[in-house]
Structures are given as structure tokens and as C-alpha cells.
Regions:
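Short, glycine/serine-rich, charged loops/turns that create anion-binding
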Residues: 11, 75, 519
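Short coil/turn motifs at beta-sheet boundaries
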Residues: 169, 266, 283, 461-463, ...
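Detector for glycine-centered tight turns/loop "hinges" at secondary-structure junctions
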Residues: 268, 297-298, 348, 446, ...
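Cross-family detector of peptidyl-prolyl cis-trans isomerase
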Residues: 410-547
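Bacterial Sec-dependent N-terminal signal peptides
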Residues: 1-21
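Extracytoplasmic
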Residues: 20-264, 274-279, 283-413
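Short, amphipathic alpha-helical segments
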Residues: 263-267, 423
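Short Pro-Gly-centered flexible turn/kink motifs
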Residues: 269-273
Length: 547
């Protein structure tokens, strides 16, 4: 009877809480491991760098005693390591053994709740390996309700902002801005600005020497790993890409079309992202295009345009996120601001997005990592994760930012690749003419043309309303549009190529225009049948003009 009472007392007082084991493969090395794998299914192994420290993090919800033990071994005699936790430091002789030995390190009084860290460092080494660590064992009254990551995935939790669209809104453009504060850009960070049901668009830190702007669109179907298994009718097709942009397929996290542009973005400046959607109900596909605004030159750049099959939808399921995509440095703090979100309806009207909802990936939802946050500062939403700081938000929390009331002004005609694309267009046109596919006899203001039939009326003027028959096609001969009956339009509302070319023709005449992309739609995706940067060919018969 006395034993039962004693056990009950111990449990209630916290002294009877079972010891907790932190697996050795859940720690972090500083500096982070590069070549040889440190953290394996057997714990910490191949720790050979005496300047490298190892850290294990945990969260205590109670004060009291903390007893620390470590299960470790080494192949070398005489090795010693320093172990510190909660302001106390211990010098530990590493057992020389071929099997792991559980060694008691010492006791630490815990006066405050919060995150704590066990730090291991080399003190004396006599061989190559400092120590192999199978696990860290914690006991004592303070560990009741302890939290730590017990899984080998060491990434910080991914954090998201979800933006709700108004009912019946047909979003054709999604605009967002990202600002990363100083120190908020560790390696292996992906700050994603414009996410939607079929893809995502943002910026990454890929290595010490490379950063990227990345735009990806998922294939149709359910294949998660191998894109070679995706049928052609389910594959995303590249329509166009910007200069020096790499475009290829991807797998292992779903499959799809990937594009990236190497660009040394920095903390401090605000970066602007724009995604457009051009749905085609006839083919049940949507063309998604990503544009990035380069602040140094104050111009937009086309990243890539992809045609997504089995779609036909407008932009929906809009979101942003911050991701730590490799776990070697998952202990580091990441933060970004997301501001000035706008969407454009199919009728051309812009709407500002003022509300967001916070969500987490499985790492956060399962409680493996609890260091994350979100909110509003200076009129912008923010996300942070990592750093083993206390969370200031929970799943599903909503936020509202103040309105800016100024929709984005976007000029895609003046873009960073204009001169390069102009040279490419000239070559394409020259090759087409040289091969005899097209004939042109004249050139004016960047436009190539040929009078196919002389008219008997006056010359067309830009201010005219024109009645005309026309056929439009790409350089490869593929027709994208043609009139069945004479069409009537105000010339000054059409593309620049028509405004330059039609005044060269008389009423009753017929003209062929070969229009470089800069005088056509440039990098814009304006038709499912016209990729960005397309050279356009038009045969136009001027029937009549009106003032």
C-alpha cells in the first residue's frame, strides 16, 4: 500500500515522468555538413571536424530538474567532448567502445520554460572521429510535456498564407511582393510569392554562390515521382521562356514543368511577381505565365510560360509560403514580408487582397516543429519559421492588412529582354524570307511588309475605324485567327504592328505584315494560340475606312 502511495506521489510531482530520448540523427552541425553524411539512421556519425559543434533542441513546458545522459561511443581512446545546456557546461570522456554506452552527464536546474539546446563540442581528440552519438536522454521533473523533433527530417516547418477569392471572381492575374529583412535569407530557403492550384512562383537561396527566381507548373494526373511515366496528354508544355532562363521537367514532388533564372536577389529590396492565366475552354487547358520585376533596371522579365492540360480554369487556390527545402540548416531563422497583393478579373478590374489565413505543412501540424509565426507589420503580412523561437500563431489564424488602394501598373512591352528578343526576331524573319517561305519587299519602323494588291482609295490613317478581312498566323504557318466576314475595329486600339503597317496600304488594297514580337504582343500571353515573343504574320485586305 505504501509503495502505491509513493508511486502516485512521484507521478504527481513530476519525478516519475518517463525519460525522453532525442534521436542522434535529429541534430544540427555548425558549420553544417557538406560532403560526408553526419546524420544517419544510426545517429550522429563521422564527426571529425574539431571546429564543428553539434546541437539538439527541445522545448520545456515546466521548470524543475533536468537530468542529461548521452548514448555515445568512439573508436579512439582518450577523446573528450564539452557538453553544455541551460548555462552549465560538462566535460565528458567519450567511452572507447564498439557499442554505444549510455553515460550520465549531469543535472541542470530549469528556472524558465521555453526552448533549450544541448551543445556538443570537441575538447580532446586522439583519432579521426570525435564521437558517435546514438541519442540524447533527458529526465527529471522539467520534462513533463517536453517537445522535440523525433524524426530524421530536420527541415523547419513550411508556413503558408492562403488568400480567399471572392465568389465568381475570374482571376487572370495575381500580383504579389516579397521583402526579406537582413539576416532572413539562409541557404535552402524558398520564399514563394504567387502560388496557385497548378503551380508556384518565387525566389530561392540555392547555394553560397547562387540564387534563383523559380516558376513551376504541375502536370495533370497523379504521378508523384517519375515524369517519364506521365503521358504526353498530361504533360505541361513550355510555350516560351526568357533569356538565360533554364526550363526543364521535374519530378519527386509531383511532376511538371520547371523554370529558373539565376539572379542574385538580396535582403532589403522589394521584389515583384506576377502570374497570369489564359484559360481555353475549347482545349480544356490554361496557359500560366510568370513575370519578375527587376528593381535595378525597373523592368519586367519573362521567366516562362507553360500550357497546362486538363485545366481550362482561372487562377484559384492562391497562396504564399516560406520553405526550408533542405534540413541541414533547419535550425536557422527565416522571415519574409508579403505585401500589396492584387488580383485582376477577366473584365480587367483589379481587386486588392487584404485578408490571409495561416496554415502549416505536416511537420508543423504533427508538432515535430513548433517554431513558426505569422502576422501583419507595417501593412504587410509576414511569415517566419525556424530559429527555435516561440510560436505567435496557430493553424487557421486569420490576418488583415491595411489597403494600399493603388493597383499595380504593369508595362510588359518595355522588358529586360527586349533587345535580345529583337535580334532573335530579326534572325527568325531573315531565315523565313531566305527560305522562300515568305516574301517581303519593304521595312519601316521595325516592321516588314509587302503590298499584295494596290488599292484605289486613300491611305489608311491610325485614327480610322477600319473594315477589313484578315488572316493571322505564326512564322511556322500555323493560323491563330482569321475573319469570316469583314471585321470592324478602331485601328488605334490594335497592336503597334497594325498601327505602323496599315497606313502603308490604300483602301481596296491588300498587305502582308511580318510583325516582330515587340510590335505584337511582346512577352504577354494574350491568346492560347500565340506564345509570348511570337513573330506574327497578317494578310490584311482593307475593305473600307471610317472617320
Amino acid at each position: 500500500m505504501h509503495k502505491i502511495i509513493l508511486i502516485g506521489y512521484l507521478l504527481l510531482s513530476g519525478l516519475g515522468v518517463s525519460a525522453q530520448t532525442i534521436p542522434g540523427n535529429t541534430g544540427y552541425a555548425i558549420p553544417a555538413e557538406t560532403q560526408e553524411e553526419l546524420f544517419t539512421s544510426n545517429g550522429l556519425q563521422h564527426w571529425t571536424d574539431s571546429k564543428q559543434i553539434i546541437q539538439y533542441f527541445f522545448y520545456l513546458r515546466n521548470t524543475g530538474s533536468l537530468e542529461l545522459s548521452i548514448k555515445l561511443k568512439t573508436a579512439s581512446k582518450g577523446n573528450q567532448i564539452k557538453v553544455s545546456v541551460g548555462g552549465k557546461e560538462f566535460l565528458v570522456a567519450v567511452p572507447h567502445n564498439d557499442k554505444f554506452v549510455l553515460k550520465k552527464i549531469g543535472s541542470v536546474p530549469i528556472h524558465d520554460t521555453g526552448f533549450y539546446c544541448v551543445t556538443l563540442g570537441a575538447f580532446k581528440t586522439t583519432g579521426k572521429t570525435i564521437a558517435d552519438i546514438e541519442s540524447i536522454q533527458l529526465s527529471g521533473s522539467s520534462i513533463k510535456g517536453i517537445q522535440f523533433n523525433s524524426k530524421p527530417r530536420r527541415n523547419a516547418a513550411s508556413v503558408h498564407l492562403r488568400y480567399a477569392l471572392p465568389d465568381s471572381f475570374k482571376a487572370i492575374q495575381f500580383y504579389n511582393e516579397i521583402t526579406v529583412p537582413p539576416g532572413g535569407d539562409p541557404l535552402y530557403t524558398y520564399y514563394m510569392a504567387c502560388g496557385f492550384k497548378r503551380g508556384y512562383f518565387g525566389m530561392q537561396v540555392n547555394s553560397e554562390t547562387e540564387r534563383r527566381i523559380i516558376f513551376s507548373v504541375w502536370d495533370a494526373g497523379a504521378e508523384a515521382v517519375d515524369r517519364d511515366k506521365v503521358s504526353r496528354e498530361n504533360k505541361v508544355q513550355l510555350q516560351a521562356k526568357g533569356d538565360q532562363v533554364v526550363a526543364e521537367g521535374f519530378g519527386n514532388e509531383g511532376t511538371g514543368g520547371h523554370s529558373h533564372w539565376v539572379y542574385n536577389w538580396k535582403p532589403g529590396p522589394t521584389y515583384k511577381f506576377l502570374v497570369t492565366a489564359l484559360p481555353d475552354s475549347a482545349s480544356k487547358s490554361t496557359i500560366y505565365t510568370g513575370y519578375f520585376f527587376i528593381p535595378e533596371v525597373q523592368q519586367w522579365k519573362l521567366i516562362a510560360s507553360f500550357k497546362a492540360p486538363k485545366d481550362g480554369s482561372y487562377l484559384n487556390h492562391l497562396y504564399s509560403f516560406s520553405e526550408n527545402f533542405m534540413g541541414e540548416n533547419g535550425q536557422l531563422f527565416r522571415k519574409a514580408y508579403f505585401g500589396n497583393q492584387w488580383i485582376q478579373n477577366s473584365d480587367g478590374k483589379w481587386k486588392e487582397l487584404l485578408n490571409s489565413r495561416f496554415t502549416l505543412d505536416a511537420t508543423g501540424q504533427d508538432g515535430d516543429r513548433i517554431d513558426y509565426g505569422a502576422g501583419v507589420e507595417d501593412g504587410k503580412f509576414y511569415l517566419w519559421h525556424g530559429g527555435f523561437k516561440e510560436a505567435n500563431v496557430k493553424y487557421g489564424d486569420s490576418f488583415t492588412r491595411r489597403a494600399n488602394n493603388q493597383s499595380p501598373v504593369i508595362n510588359l512591352y518595355k522588358n529586360t529582354d527586349s533587345s535580345i528578343q529583337a535580334a532573335e526576331d530579326r534572325k527568325l524573319i531573315y531565315d523565313a524570307v531566305s527560305s522562300g517561305k515568305y516574301d517581303t519587299t519593304a521595312y519601316k519602323n521595325g516592321l516588314y511588309y509587302k503590298i499584295l494588291k494596290e488599292g484605289d482609295g486613300r491611305y489608311v490613317q491610325v485614327s480610322d475605324t477600319v473594315v477589313a478581312n484578315y488572316k493571322g498566323y505564326l512564322l511556322n504557318g500555323e493560323i491563330f485567327d482569321q475573319s469570316k466576314v469583314p471585321a470592324t475595329f478602331a485601328l488605334n486600339r490594335l497592336i503597334k504592328g497594325w498601327q505602323v503597317g496599315l497606313p502603308l496600304c490604300k483602301v481596296g488594297g491588300k498587305i502582308r505584315l511580318i510583325i516582330p514580337s515587340a510590335l505584337g504582343y511582346s512577352i504577354r500571353a494574350r491568346s492560347p494560340k500565340i506564345p509570348p515573343n511570337s513573330v506574327l504574320v497578317f494578310d490584311i485586305e482593307v475593305v473600307a475606312v471610317k472617320k
